[in-house]
A protein has these predicted regions:
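Binuclear metal-dependent hydrolase catalytic cores
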Residues: 1-204, 209-212
Length: 213
């Protein structure tokens, strides 16, 4: 597998737009040891040609620009993208807002839990993702999911989603919904990501609130 870290900053990126903490001043002053960073996201490929995004950050347009492997391929016609799927680990703004950058009627798959797909469905702004081109695929926890291209061909990557400590996205918190704002297991997940042969794997846990010893 080929793995690209598209962004590694927390919500809002680094530096955050309204932050005057000394750490945030460093990139503005050109400190080479504190470069600006975009919000967290990965790109993964089994063949180096077609790619899967793990979360779609608000900085996605810039992340695509900065990574030529995600550029439209010049021999594939007027419209093309190597991005064939997006996997969402929760409904945080930092992880779903970038979907709006992918609205140009380009075919790809969205993989997420039923809970997160419900959030997308309840917010009409995501209807800019034309369902004739963009398929929303529900994932069940603790079961392997083979990632597919829009035409149904395997991408050579299998994921295993499982619940981790966390909560519902900040913008969905409901103080009247009970403990932890009414959060359920499908609100925050982690992923074991494996190649098709099961020879290599890694874990992606961008919103895990705590880890046991």
């Amino acid at each position: 597998m080929k793995i690209r870290v598209l962004g590694s900053a927390a919500g809002g990126g680094y530096p955050q737009w309204n932050c005057n903490h000394p750490n945030s001043l460093r990139p503005r002053r050109g400190d080479p040891e504190a470069p600006p960073r975009t919000q967290s996201s990965l790109a993964v490929s089994a063949d180096g040609d077609d790619w899967v995004l793990f979360n779609a950050s608000p900085d996605l347009r810039q992340q695509i620009f900065d990574n030529p492997v995600l550029h439209p391929r010049p021999d594939r016609g007027l419209r093309d993208s190597p991005i064939k799927a997006v996997v969402l680990t929760n409904a945080d703004v930092d992880h779903v807002a970038g979907l709006l950058n992918l609205r140009e009627s380009q075919a790809f798959q969205i993989y997420a839990t039923e809970r997160v797909l419900g959030v997308l469905g309840a917010n009409s702004i995501f209807n800019v993702l034309n369902p004739d081109f963009v398929t929303r695929v529900p994932m069940r926890l603790d079961r392997d999911v083979e990632l597919l291209r829009p035409n149904g061909d395997p991408l050579g990557i299998t994921i295993h989603p499982f619940a981790v400590p966390g909560k519902v996205a900040l913008w969905l918190e409901d103080e009247g919904a009970g403990e932890n704002f009414g959060s359920v297991d499908e609100d925050t997940i982690a992923l074991e990501v494996k190649d098709a042969a099961g020879r290599t794997c890694f874990f992606y846990m961008p919103a895990c609130a705590r880890i046991t010893e």
